[in-house]
Amino acid sequence: MGMFSNLKRTSDIEESKDTLGGFILESDIYTTNIVTAYSDFFKSGAQYINVKFLVTKPDGSTQNFNERFTITNKQGSIFYVGKDGKKHALPGYEIMDDMCLLTTGKTLAEQETEKKVLMIWNSNEGKEVPTEVDCLVDLFGKDILLAIQKIRRNKQVADASGKYIDSKEEQFLNQSRKVFDAEYKATVPEIRTAERNNVAPEATFINKWLAKNKGVTLDEYKEIISGTSAGFSGSTGNANGASAQTRIFGRRAS
């Protein structure tokens, strides 16, 4: 049984919908290779997956991009209850589940892990050190298209009590917003629709995302009058006459 088998999406958690919503990358959709992916826990007890990507930029050069995707809260739940009163998967879980489906044909809950030693940053030593971690090995080396957003926020600093709060200083960072299939350029919802209708996926959301977000910096910076304020919290017919069925996720599981 895999370490994510208890994190299955139940029927009362809403399916995702396509909504627009090192060096800093400009907002764009990038051809991306998954170098490594491993799971660990924050001190709070929340579980995350750290993914190292190799991003190909428009000029053909490549850049490493690391991101942590929080897949549970500290109670081990994969969902939150939205303003609509419905359960929604955590954004980090949603992206990782889509990433797993698009690259392996299996959900995050179906992924197996292997212990491997990776070079991981150790804050106490101030450098990367060999560390044994639980790796999602089936993701290693797989390609995806990743919608990356450039964001402007307040830089957070520790106050006297050690709590992190917003400062006046601005910072720019990148966050993954959506995952697209490298072959079809389609999202998981688009592929699900195609499979239900036994047709090839129609990739339309990718152009909508680009039209709204390409080159746009999402400004979440808050003006601070004096001192610091409370921290910002926030961080996709066969031969025998039977009808053929388009199974994109299924064939990637083999």
Please annotate each region the language model reported.
Residues 1-254:
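Short beta-rich binding modules
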